[in-house]
Every structure is written in structure tokens, then in C-alpha cells.
């Protein structure tokens, strides 16, 4: 269920400050964050944000199509390796 337009997008303040500083300095280093719940804003386009997936930080290069989505959508937390093959079918 999307957030109400009356409330506006949610973004953690500490992440917003880091983004403003990086944009001001034209810094190309990834911004490390644990805030998967923050929404991607137009100010983030072109920046690389390292989003934590529970084990490591996954670098996410933000483009215009990602605006409006959450950061956590682009850093998967589960590792699916497929089902084990049935040994009876091989015989």
C-alpha cells in the first residue's frame, strides 16, 4: 500500500544529509546506508548508494526509473539457489 501523498516521501534524515553533502562536493564514492526503508528521491539520481542486505553493502547506481521506489527493493536479502534435482528422475 503506497504512502499518502499528503505525508510525502519518507527518507531518513541522516541519509538525506549525506546525499546533500555528496551532491555539493560532487563526490563519486558510494554512500553507505542501512536505511532500506528510505524512498529514492530525484536528488539521488547519478549517485551510488551502498544498501545493506543483512550481510554486506550492495552498491546501487540510482537512475531516473528508480525514483519513487525504496532502496531495499534493489538489494535482495534472500539467496535462492534452486531446488535440488530429483535423483529418481536421473535413473
Curated annotation (Swiss-Prot):
- GO CC, alphabetical: cytoplasm; small ribosomal subunit
Q: Which UniProt keywords apply?
A: Ribonucleoprotein, Ribosomal protein, RNA-binding, rRNA-binding
**What InterPro entries has UniProt attached to this entry?**
Ribosomal_uS19, Ribosomal_uS19_bac-type, Ribosomal_uS19_CS, Ribosomal_uS19_SF
The molecular function GO annotations come to:
rRNA binding; structural constituent of ribosome
Task: Note the coiled coil stretches, chain numbering.
Answer: none
Q: Name one Pfam family in it.
A: Ribosomal_S19
* GO terms classed as biological process: ribosomal small subunit assembly; translation
**Its biological purpose:** Protein S19 forms a complex with S13 that binds strongly to the 16S ribosomal RNA.
The record's NCBIfam families line, in alphabetical order, gives: rpsS_bact
Record-linked HAMAP family: Ribosomal_uS19
Q: Give the family, as the similarity comment puts it.
A: Belongs to the universal ribosomal protein uS19 family.
Q: What is this protein called?
A: Small ribosomal subunit protein uS19
Gene responsible for this protein: rpsS
Amino acid at each position: 500500500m503506497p504512502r499518502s501523498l499528503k505525508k510525502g516521501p519518507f527518507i531518513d534524515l541522516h541519509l538525506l544529509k549525506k546525499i546533500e553533502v555528496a551532491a555539493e562536493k560532487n563526490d563519486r564514492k558510494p554512500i553507505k546506508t542501512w536505511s532500506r526503508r528510505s524512498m529514492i528521491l530525484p536528488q539521488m539520481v547519478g549517485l551510488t548508494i551502498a544498501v545493506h542486505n543483512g550481510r554486506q553493502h550492495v552498491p546501487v547506481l540510482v537512475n531516473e526509473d528508480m525514483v519513487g521506489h525504496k532502496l531495499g527493493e534493489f538489494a535482495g536479502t534472500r539467496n535462492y539457489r534452486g531446488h535440488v534435482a530429483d535423483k529418481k528422475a536421473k535413473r
